[in-house]
Amino acid sequence: MSAWRAERVVLAAIVAAAMATPAVAAPDTYDPARYRVVLEHVTARRTELGARYAAARSGQARAAIRNEARRFVVETLVSQVFPAWMGMPSGGGPQATASLPHEPGMYISCSYFLTAALQNAGLVLESRARFSQAPAAWIERALLPPGGQIHRYGNLSAGELEQRLVALGEGLYVVGLNIHVGFIVVRDGHAWFVHSSYTPPGTVVNEPLTSSMAIDLSRRKGYWVSPLFQDDRIVELWLRHQPVPAPPQWKGVWSPEPGSL
């Protein structure tokens, strides 16, 4: 069973009361028309940067454009995409696969939130379903270049984990937990966990990592952390509008043992 499916089992026990209610309306702060403008800007910016990248004639020029694209994607995710998804109800089943924030009648699971956010920021995925239904570490490996490192931290408190993440450097990361996956943003000496939470309040949240129930619940099994948009491969794929190859189709039986993600 993948993290996506295992999460649903725990979700029923932890937030049954919350999930018994219908999907809530989009918060007043979410403006669908404004978000469409954000998505259009992402497309236009990727097209403009991609054209410049294709025309660049030196390695130095290409590196500068990659860095410009990297900054744009990360800042767009943090300042535009993540805020738009806040409050979207978490859930399971075929209604948990929303592609845009606050789609009427829809929920969002942890891995489908991760893939939707990446797609909203202009990243093309070979198969959203295969990404979203794979174990967390498979998702991370697919987003990393060949040989890219997944940092494994075992039995650390949330405070200790935050210290390790801050030591890795500011930026965006993917974290796999025992039955969960999400984003981590490291800025100004602190780490924030952005995810579709299977713990209360049962919505997409941006919370301090040190106070996250989902982080605490994974302490015994550990945490798997990988950098996102910090290597040239994924930035080049974004610039060229080329798909990130998907993980293999997951057909195994999920196990919570360390490394099984």
Question: Which role fits each region the language model picked out?
Answer:
Residues 1-2, 25:
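Initiator methionine at the very start of the polypeptide chain
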Residues 2-11:
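Bacterial N-terminal signal peptides that target proteins for export
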Residues 10-18:
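Bacterial N-terminal signal peptides
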